[in-house]
Amino acid sequence: MTDSTVSSAKSDPVLVNHEERLGVHSLAVDAIDQVLMNSKLHYLGNAARIIEPMRHLAILTCMDARIDVSALLGLRPGDAHVIRNAGGRASTDALHALAISQAVMHTCEVMVIHHTDCALGRFSQAQLDEQISAASGHRFAEELGCFTDPIGAIAQDVASLRASPYLPARDKIRGFIYDLSTNLLTEVSSRDRTPN
């Protein structure tokens, strides 16, 4: 196969998808390029429109790839805003997203979903600092959201969001823990535990 043949094959999403289905990995295609190709095939002709989430719901959860929010909650595209970060913590960036979600897109309910076996519960701030520093040569000045008490962390995040003046709809903010081993979602009251 010549270089020009490889180049044209890489740009052919049908060929790449066919090879993926067959389990053939002869083409060196980056993961991002692959999902972009899949996106073009899957949504061909379906132009996106800016709409308010149909359920007026925002979900703050962890970036962990094991959590399929749509499958877990039975959501379809357009149902809810899904905001993800490390740990599903109520960080400044999460608050910004929720404030925009409520003010611009009129969401009025928030689910905060943490999960079992979360990296932020398994590593300390110092351990994560060390790993990030070793990989990048830099350290974050701010806390990364590590916790030792999962229930307390959810309670802390829910309480923090309920107290935020930037969220006009604060009465329907609820916290949950998702058990990865059982696939069960359990509600946690913000008064269940006091975080460490």
Predicted regions and their residues:
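Divalent-metal-activated hydrolytic enzyme cores
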Residues: 2-53, 87-93, 104, 120-196
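Conserved beta-strand-loop surface patch within small alpha/beta domains used
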Residues: 37-97
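Residues at the starts of beta-strands that form the adenosine-phosphate
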Residues: 56, 109, 172
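A structural signal for short, well-ordered beta-strand segments
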Residues: 59, 112, 174-175
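Fold-independent oxyanion-binding glycine-rich loops
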Residues: 62-63, 85-86, 115-116, 178-180
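Solvent-exposed loop/turn segments at secondary-structure junctions
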Residues: 66, 118-119
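Alpha-helix C-terminal capping segments
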Residues: 74, 102-107
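Ordered, amphipathic secondary-structure segments that act as subunit-interaction surfaces
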Residues: 106-115
